């Protein structure tokens, strides 16, 4: 399925049904009193977060959504039925905003969470409601109240405990493939990952956490360069970030400058995102050139108070220690096998 994480929706709640003008007409009763019923309430527009949904694709194909109108009242004091609510199911993690003002209206972060965003119009009162001692035969009724309309912006932010961050081809997809059942495309060229993917990572004692892989970040990403800028928002809910650094290209490229460039892009995109806990991971430890440069790189980070975790997704070396560090940061302790 194509991954769609943003969509604009034009939604309308239902108009209320009209009240009825009617009078009793029975044998031997020539001039019966008013008995027009009330109109029914219009349907609401309701959003529900549903586990199992992973994209807003279906809503992109149906941008105009309208709840049912309330039914009109009838004679003999019969009230109109309420219009059916329009229930729109969205992935967990969907944020709904007013497309015009940008105001956030709802953040559906839990499975089953529901919110009524647009209320249906009230039904109009029938003429039976307006009879009085001085006005016994009212020949008017209320129209139904109009429903509400809104232009909404829906934005999906993936729900993950751990987010992967780094340049294109830094080894993010290889890592998530190694430790989870996720199968993103992997190749030896930039931007093989063109959409976010989630993987459930099993840990010790049947515990697990969710990891998100997004396209690599390049310089200028906060201004729209590359692919990663579109997907940085998917890291905003992550508890911690793994910043993957590939040092195998030294000296052709400077991995330390690249690390600082990615950190800069993160800060310019969102200072709050940049302030999240980060774990620095040196990838491709199975390559000889990585091992040759590791001590130099480790020293640079340690001088800045940053511990690094060298790993190889190909052989699994260092991966267990990295998972223990993730567990310690997520849950405050490392699990022991039993």
Curated annotation (Swiss-Prot):
InterPro entries: G_OBG (IPR031167), GTP-bd (IPR006073), GTP-bd_Obg/CgtA (IPR014100), GTP1-OBG_CS (IPR006074), GTP1_OBG_dom (IPR006169), GTP1_OBG_dom_sf (IPR036726), OBG_GTPase (IPR045086), P-loop_NTPase (IPR027417). GO terms for biological process: ribosome biogenesis. Its main location: cytoplasm. Residues 1-159 form the Obg domain. Pfam families: GTP1_OBG, MMR_HSR1. GTP binds at residues 166-173, 191-195, 213-216, 283-286, 312-314. The keyword Magnesium applies. It is found in: Cytoplasm. Mg(2+) binds at residues 173, 193. Residues 160-331 form the OBG-type G domain. SUPFAM superfamilies: Obg GTP-binding protein N-terminal domain, P-loop containing nucleoside triphosphate hydrolases. An essential GTPase which binds GTP, GDP and possibly (p)ppGpp with moderate affinity, with high nucleotide exchange rates and a fairly low GTP hydrolysis rate. Plays a role in control of the cell cycle, stress response, ribosome biogenesis and in those bacteria that undergo differentiation, in morphogenesis control. This is GTPase Obg. It comes from Pelobacter propionicus (strain DSM 2379 / NBRC 103807 / OttBd1).
């Amino acid at each position: 399925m194509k991954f769609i994480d943003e969509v604009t929706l034009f939604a309308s709640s239902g108009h209320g049904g009209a009240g009825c003008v009617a009078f009793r007409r029975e044998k031997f009763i020539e001039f019966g009193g008013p008995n027009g019923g009330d109109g029914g309430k219009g349907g609401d527009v309701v959003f529900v977060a549903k586990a199992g949904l992973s994209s807003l694709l279906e809503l992109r194909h149906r941008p105009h959504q309208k709840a049912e109108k309330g039914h009109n009242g009838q004679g003999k004091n019969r009230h109109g039925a309420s219009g059916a609510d329009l229930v729109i199911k969205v992935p967990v993690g969907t944020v709904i905003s007013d497309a015009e003002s940008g105001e956030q209206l709802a953040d559906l972060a839990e499975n089953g969470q529901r919110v009524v965003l647009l209320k249906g119009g009230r039904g109009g009162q029938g003429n039976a409601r307006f009879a009085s001692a001085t006005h016994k035969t009212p020949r008017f009724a209320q129209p139904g109240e109009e429903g509400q309309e809104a232009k909404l912006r829906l934005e999906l932010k993936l729900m993950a405990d751990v987010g992967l961050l780094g340049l294109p081809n830094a080894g993010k997809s290889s890592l998530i493939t190694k430790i989870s059942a996720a199968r993103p495309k992997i190749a030896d060229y930039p931007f093989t990952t063109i959409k976010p993917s989630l993987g459930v990572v099993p840990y010790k004692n049947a515990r697990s956490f969710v990891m998100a892989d997004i396209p690599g970040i390049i310089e200028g990403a906060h201004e729209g360069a590359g692919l990663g800028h579109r997907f940085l928002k998917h890291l905003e809910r992550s508890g911690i970030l793994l910043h993957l650094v590939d040092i195998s290209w030294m000296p052709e490229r400077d991995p330390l400058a690249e690390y600082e460039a990615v950190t800069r892009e993160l800060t310019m995109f969102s200072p709050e995102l940049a302030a999240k806990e980060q774990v620095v991971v040196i990838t491709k430890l199975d390559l000889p050139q990585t091992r040759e440069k590791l001590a130099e790189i480790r020293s640079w980070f340690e001088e800045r108070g940053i511990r690094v975790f060298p790993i190889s997704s190909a052989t699994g070396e260092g991966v267990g220690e990295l998972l223990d560090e993730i567990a310690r940061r997520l849950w405050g302790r490392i699990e022991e096998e039993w």
